[in-house]
A protein has these predicted regions:
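C-terminal and late-domain segments of enzyme folds
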Residues: 2-38, 47-61, 65-68, 147-241
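A general structural motif
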Residues: 8, 36-41, 97, 130
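General beta-strand structural signal in soluble alpha/beta enzymes
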Residues: 13, 75-76, 101-102, 133-136, ...
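Short, flexible loop segments at the rims of nucleotide/cofactor-binding pockets, characterized by
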Residues: 17-21, 76-81, 109-113, 175-177
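Portal/gating segments that form or line small-molecule/metal binding sites
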Residues: 42, 48-105, 109
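Class I SAM-dependent methyltransferase SAM-binding "motif I" and its flanking Rossmann-like core
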Residues: 103, 111-179
Length: 241
């Protein structure tokens, strides 16, 4: 379990499974790291907005139910797009949270909604003051330095890379890693920005890190690519970035 300590808070990169029982142990540990009896949680379902309002609101409701059951005070922050992300009230909600959760969907939409906005700045500031940040799938991708994006393209190659929030410098993330053929994942890795580390995070699995030390939690493995060199880590194992 991570304990409350000065400086930047923990970051959890989740391959899939947000708000499901399989992630309850991981999320409970992150809540405990706040040191509060009733931590405040902000849920950002922004990445799912392109999938429609029904999906967007379902993720918000699932997040509220999941974290309420873990003893948290939960506020879904209903940021649809970039305009909403410049709303001071939304930024304030992030600023008051002990844990900020970015759920899955479309990473390109999430990036374009948050970068250079009040909410984006509030997420970074929350991390720096000690709040836990959790990103699942698309959310995990944008907590890193850069991410790939497939949208509106007939050809996947070469990959198009976008800047992310850069809370984990020189790192890119492939979520749902065990759902991809690894030969395809290797092609992603080979096109990653020069000198970047790529983290492949299996479904129902998290890499939880602080101060450069990362532990694997959940059901699967984390695959760490340094260029063409690959290492795998299982539940409970630790690696450094």
């Amino acid at each position: 379990m991570l304990s409350r300590m000065p400086g930047p808070g923990p970051i959890a990169l989740v391959g899939s499974g947000e708000f499901l029982p399989v992630m309850a142990e991981v999320d409970a540990g992150l809540l405990a790291s706040s040191g509060r009896s009733r931590p405040r949680v902000a849920i950002l379902p922004t990445a799912s907005w392109p999938d429609g309002e029904t999906v967007f609101r379902r993720w918000a409701a699932m997040g509220a139910e999941h974290f309420s059951a873990l003893g948290a005070e939960v506020e879904p922050v209903l940021v649809l797009d970039r305009l909403d992300a410049d709303d001071e009230a939304h930024a304030q909600a992030i600023g008051e949270a002990d844990l900020v959760y970015l759920s899955g969907g479309k990473p390109g939409h999430l990036t374009e909604s948050l970068l250079g906005t009040r909410v984006g700045a509030a997420i970074v500031a929350a991390h720096e003051r000690g709040a836990a940040l959790v990103g699942c799938s698309a959310g995990a991708m944008i907590l890193a330095a850069r991410h790939f994006d497939f949208r509106m393209r007939r050809l996947l190659w070469p990959l198009r890379w976008q800047d992310s929030l850069d809370l984990i410098p020189a790192v890119t993330v492939i979520p749902h890693y065990d759902a991809w053929p690894e030969a395809l994942s290797a092609m992603f890795v080979l096109q990653a920005p020069r000198h970047f580390v790529t983290l492949g995070i299996d479904e129902d699995t998290a890499a939880v890190g602080r101060d450069g030390s990362w532990q694997v939690q959940g059901a699967g493995r984390v695959t760490v690519w340094h260029g063409r060199r690959r290492e795998r880590f299982r539940r409970g194992e630790v690696f450094r970035l």
